[in-house]
């Protein structure tokens, strides 16, 4: 038997860090939403009691470093499943980009194995399993648009944002999320208006949503990688309505209300960056049945 799952990317419309916890994690408040850029996860049941991961992308690990592998092992061991699975990952989301590609692959694996092995687990249970794998996996189980708190595992769903285009540009650099969080100084930083972003989304106001964009990690990554600032500036220059770095970076996204501007911005950025995407903000939850 074979199961197919989409694993959509996410962007952070608002990302705040409120404190560092004793366990080394940080308390966050984030507004995340899914976009129309997705990996494809193909799950095939194996008679052998093992987990295999493969991908055409050479940057995708095929062992326990892969979050989809971890997801399969976790659900298999937790529910004493004696069958195996082959996980084929067709990558569309850029790797190590701040778009939760690995987390979304893990979440899609949890959803898919729940169906493949007829486990009948609730979305809440899958999200709890996801939290054991990574901070973004719980959100990615559901998708849609949500306020994430705690270390990112506490999810409260909110309305779908106003429809718009999202231009993504990823420079050819790698950013360590752990390094960015270590370098973050909570004293004296400007915190984004998370509640204001929720209100803008509830009101379906594109202009207010643009004005409330914020990410406390952005200044840290920009100090480490000036290339990110350059892409932000170019995206603004070519006409994006609002621009922000997603997650810990290095991907920058621009919100664009009118389709007539999209091609110009996309073409302009292609001169500065190899990985450029023009997609829609979807913000709708994944099918979980």
UniProtKB/Swiss-Prot annotation:
Keywords: ATP-binding, Isoprene biosynthesis, Kinase, Nucleotide-binding, Transferase. Gene3D superfamilies: 3.30.230.10, GHMP kinase, C-terminal domain. Pathway: Isoprenoid biosynthesis; isopentenyl diphosphate biosynthesis via DXP pathway; isopentenyl diphosphate from 1-deoxy-D-xylulose 5-phosphate: step 3/6. ATP binds at residues 94-104. Pfam families: GHMP_kinases_C, GHMP_kinases_N. It catalyses: 4-CDP-2-C-methyl-D-erythritol + ATP = 4-CDP-2-C-methyl-D-erythritol 2-phosphate + ADP + H(+). It comes from the Bacteria. One of its GO terms (biological process) is isopentenyl diphosphate biosynthetic process, methylerythritol 4-phosphate pathway. One of its GO terms (molecular function) is ATP binding. Its EC number is 2.7.1.148. Catalyzes the phosphorylation of the position 2 hydroxy group of 4-diphosphocytidyl-2C-methyl-D-erythritol. This is 4-diphosphocytidyl-2-C-methyl-D-erythritol kinase.
